[in-house]
Amino acid sequence: MKLIRISLIFLSLINLSNADSIYKNNFESYELNKFPDDMMEIDGLFKVNKNDQGKKHLEMASEPLTENAVIFGPSIKNSATLEVKVRGFRKRRSFPRFGIGLHGISGFRLRVVPSKNKVELVKNEEPVKSVPFKWNPEKWSILRLQIEFSNDKSLIKGWVWDDGSTPPVEPVITFS
């Protein structure tokens, strides 16, 4: 049996047109062992749990091993940035695959694929670009996805770094 666990500890959604934070969540206000009422499970089973330091986080169940998702925050159609602190756990020869997305199910996603040592930008379930990336299973990861619209064109940028280290100035992956 393969067991893989994914946890989210912080979510932030920013509207780039006026730089206001329109959604923040650290899960501290939610009841333990329940799924938050203001979020929606697409697939998989999720619940609020606590880590060793007592901080609450959203945790995905180890099974079933499928592509799982949670939708949260207000609907956004314009330029925005999403930043999430996430941790995936490796078990034996199994690796997690995790990511974040903007603009709904068919929007762009920034996905970390440790089994292939890469980061991908995905649109409509298909990778549109990938770059090499070495995941650290011992650390929480920070993922930031930014979509900018200008003159009917979009620029998608993705950053990934270990929690506690300095965020990269330049994105690790871009697509236009």
Tell what function each PLM region has.
Residues 27, 84, 138-150, 156-158:
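Short tryptophan-centered beta-strand motifs in secreted/extracellular beta-sheet-rich domains
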Residues 31-57, 66:
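Extracellular glycan-recognition surfaces and repeat-rich motifs
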Residues 53-54, 60-121:
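Secretory/extracellular carbohydrate-interaction modules
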Residues 159-176:
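Short, solvent-exposed beta-strand-to-loop segments that form ligand-recognition rims
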Residues 9-16:
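Hydrophobic core
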Residues 122-144:
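Short, aromatic/His-centered strand-loop micro-motif at the edge of beta-sheets
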Residues 17-21:
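Boundary at the C-terminal end of the N-terminal hydrophobic targeting segment
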Residues 2-9:
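Sec-dependent signal peptide recognition
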